[in-house]
Swiss-Prot record:
Residues 1-25 are annotated as: Disordered. GO terms for cellular component: cytosol. Residues 9-25 have a biased composition (Basic and acidic residues). GO terms for biological process: intracellular signal transduction; negative regulation of epidermal growth factor-activated receptor activity; positive regulation of proteasomal ubiquitin-dependent protein catabolic process; protein ubiquitination. This is Suppressor of cytokine signaling 4. Pathway: Protein modification; protein ubiquitination. Residues 373-422 form the SOCS box domain. SOCS family proteins form part of a classical negative feedback system that regulates cytokine signal transduction. Substrate-recognition component of a SCF-like ECS (Elongin BC-CUL2/5-SOCS-box protein) E3 ubiquitin-protein ligase complex which mediates the ubiquitination and subsequent proteasomal degradation of target proteins. Inhibits EGF signaling by mediating the degradation of the Tyr-phosphorylated EGF receptor/EGFR. The SOCS box domain mediates the interaction with the Elongin BC complex, an adapter module in different E3 ubiquitin ligase complexes.
Amino acid sequence: MAENNSKNVDVRPKTSRSRSADRKDGYVWSGKKLSWSKKSESCSESEAIGTVENVEIPLRSQERQLSCSSIELDLDHSCGHRFLGRSLKQKLQDAVGQCFPIKNCSGRHSPGLPSKRKIHISELMLDKCPFPPRSDLAFRWHFIKRHTVPMSPNSDEWVSADLSERKLRDAQLKRRNTEDDIPCFSHTNGQPCVITANSASCTGGHITGSMMNLVTNNSIEDSDMDSEDEIITLCTSSRKRNKPRWEMEEEILQLEAPPKFHTQIDYVHCLVPDLLQISNNPCYWGVMDKYAAEALLEGKPEGTFLLRDSAQEDYLFSVSFRRYSRSLHARIEQWNHNFSFDAHDPCVFHSPDITGLLEHYKDPSACMFFEPLLSTPLIRTFPFSLQHICRTVICNCTTYDGIDALPIPSPMKLYLKEYHYKSKVRLLRIDVPEQQ
């Protein structure tokens, strides 16, 4: 009685045990995680209980039987003669599955599944098939050998032979493209040349010997992957499609390269409009580099600034100012007869003269955090020379082109033109003549 009670205790709570397993795994189909051996044992135990106690088989055991039968049908469907009509990817997957087979069902499900025999790597290294002819393993052995790279001591020779074959094909392709008497590559041919496995005929003309050799080589190589009834298209009516790869790359580079042309830019030269007012401004220090300006601004309060000549030839003036407890510098740029600290940004304030630009940045509320603060000018401690003062007065009364009309020597004219800027007027494009 104790043994019967222990057996009943082990068998009776089977349904409740499955529910608790469902609760642990968190989803209903957790029972499918069990191995095939446990499923078959549970099925046999349920049949024994049904014969002794006349109890119906639970719905869960029926679902497991259906799942086993469906898997059996799927495996039967994937094996056997159906293996021959599948795609290359599916064939490779099935071949790998044969090397690492799926666990077989025990009991009544085992006869319908393939055998556990594996194809080892040592067997794949053999030159001859070690399996009986026309067997399933022999078919898979030949299939893997056809679609894998041979790993042998003579692999270098195989690679060199393959490279020589590729060079020969490239030479044949280049020779075929240069021959204009081939109808397949002419512009007048309107129909493609089609070659089948049984016949080689071109509707637009004949095929040369090199083309036939290329077709036979391709048909021999492709016979492993494609059936004999498939049609191989050799050429089309478009010459552009049959161009070699290097010619197409040259055409793409020519299309992508920008056109070559020369440009002629016309400038107008203008004198600084307010050079006299700048010289009269006490914050203008004339010619000075940034290191001398930093020495003058050292220890000065926030907003102290000075105006000086820029050290770069492309710019006329620069400001050195004190902000964020350090000495900073900003160039004054010119664009379209307007002066600003950033000529490429239309949102930045610009002025037609230098003095108006300095007046704008005196107000701290008008200055952004990245803009110079020019609230307190640093007074110049020396006077300018009489020569410089005379230049400012003359430039205030004439123009850049008007200086050439003045009855003065040429060196003096160059001296008067020193403070000027260039403004772009127009851009002329001069195309390069085509080389004949």
